[in-house]
Regions:
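Short, well-ordered alpha-helical
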Residues: 1-58, 81-83, 216
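Structural helix-boundary/capping segments
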Residues: 2, 62, 66, 70, ...
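Short helix-loop capping/hinge segments that flank enzyme active sites or metal/cofactor-binding pockets
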Residues: 25-43, 248-299, 355-365
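Gly/Ser-rich, acidic/histidine-flanked active-site/gating loops
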Residues: 28, 34, 182-246, 269-273, ...
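Short pre-catalytic strand/loop immediately N-terminal to key active-site residues, enriched for Gly-Thr
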Residues: 48-55, 92-107, 332-339
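Gly/Ser-rich catalytic serine loop of serine hydrolases
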Residues: 56, 100-112, 125-126, 130-131, ...
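Glycine-rich, small-residue loops and helix-cap segments
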Residues: 66, 289-391
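Acyltransferase
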Residues: 212-234, 259-264, 287-308, 336
Length: 391
């Protein structure tokens, strides 16, 4: 087995014969938290290198393989998928080719960077708070966070079993949809076109980089001319959302899924990741139970208020930051939280969400978010919007 040493990959896969199928000839990068038979699943961590090789493919990997895809290698990622910026001190940090010296975003960092460079055609990733959509925006590709229950996560190393979703990225929407059709289980999608989009007045539109704000504002008339109804108003469920200690989910649940590494070889874990995992000690069992109950209330309230409508936001409040700007912990934490802010909404409401690149502003994305089982509707809407953003 040859080893890829670029920061986009942690290891390459040996060539294999592939069956004919809907993804024949499609090169797929697999985020390094999905089991691939015969390879160690490191989840971007030196602490997992001692684990045995996977004995079988993760469900999503098996579906891609059966559809004729060519599996290229394990894509690099934030260790344990625990940040939205994509830094990895062990295997290198993937960068966006769109902005000199800027990061690719995370945690599906290597997949997005490899896509943007044309090394792969599809990146299989996960999204806990934006880990498909943030790097998609930063690298100028399309990232889909589907309804969590629509794609199996069996055989994928979890960060937060409450918020994790499995999904694809690609350079264009058509390829994302082909991959989603292969990966997703038959389900009763909610009917009705997604034509009414709400820009919330009480969430997601502050602290925007000038380039992001300008690109977003310029996109709205294009959507309206294409037949979308875009309304700026307050969403009441977001007032409840503001009360949620979102950090609880990944902090507490990562300590469950990575207990062996955290407790037995903590010195091998990225200090930035370890610090966030340590925050779980600040949440009691009662407090976390309250967080789960509040999240369930938010899901119900969002579904009731949005109905067949969707939320329209910039994918990320900021343009891709320079790697050099993230050296200090305080700066890293501030930028990480701002990067995750808009995308995390889709995970908390148990919805579906997609980021589309805005071609005129490298590193900026337009994001549609809707309640659960509106995946087909959001993909149909995105198909109408994608060409508008290429102008």
């Amino acid at each position: 087995m040859s080893q890829i040493t670029s920061p986009e990959f942690t290891q390459s896969f040996a060539p294999e014969d592939t069956p004919e199928g809907p993804l024949s000839g499609v090169r797929v990068g697999v985020k390094d938290l999905f089991d691939v038979k015969g390879y160690v699943t490191k989840a971007g961590s030196k602490a997992r290198e001692v684990l045995p090789a996977a004995r079988e493919d993760a469900d999503a990997v098996a579906l891609l393989r059966a559809a004729g895809a060519t599996l290229v290698g394990h894509n690099n990622m934030t260790e344990f998928a625990y940040s939205g910026l994509g830094l990895n001190p062990h295997y290198g940090t993937a960068m966006t080719p769109l902005v000199e010296g800027a990061i690719a975003g995370g945690s599906t960092s290597g997949g997005a960077s490899a896509l943007a460079q044309g090394i792969i055609d599809v990146a299989l990733g996960t999204d806990t708070g934006g880990s498909l959509r943030i790097p998609a925006a930063f690298c100028g590709v399309v990232g889909l966070k589907p309804t969590a229950a629509s794609i199996s996560s069996k055989g994928a190393v979890a960060l937060s079993h409450t918020l994790d979703s499995v999904g694809p990225m690609a350079r264009d929407l058509e390829t994302v949809r082909r991959a989603y059709d292969v990966l997703s289980a038959p389900a009763n999608q909610q009917s009705g076109a997604l034509t009414h989009l709400i820009v919330p007045e009480n969430f997601g539109m502050t602290e925007l980089d000038d380039g992001v704000a300008t690109a977003f504002d310029a996109a709205i008339p294009l959507l309206e001319a294409a037949g979308f109804i875009v309304e700026r108003r307050k969403l009441d469920f977001l007032d409840i959302y503001a009360q949620l200690p979102i950090w609880h989910f990944s902090a507490v649940e990562s300590r469950v899924h990575h207990a062996v590494q955290y407790e037995q070889t903590p010195e091998l874990i990225d200090p930035k990741v370890k610090l966030r995992m340590a925050r779980a000690d600040q949440a009691s069992a009662v407090e976390y139970a309250k967080t789960l109950a509040l999240r369930a209330r938010i899901v119900e309230a969002a579904q009731a208020e949005l109905g067949l409508s969707g939320v329209l936001l910039p994918s990320v409040a900021i343009l891709p930051p320079q790697l050099s700007a993230l050296e200090e912990d305080a700066a890293f934490d501030r930028i990480n939280l701002l990067a995750l802010r808009n995308t995390t909404l889709g995970n908390v409401i148990d919805g579906c969400s997609i980021s589309l690149p805005i071609a005129g502003t490298p590193g900026a994305g337009l994001m549609l978010t809707a309640p659960a089982w509106r995946d087909h509707a959001i993909l149909d809407a995105a198909a109408k919007i994608e060409p508008l953003l290429k102008r």
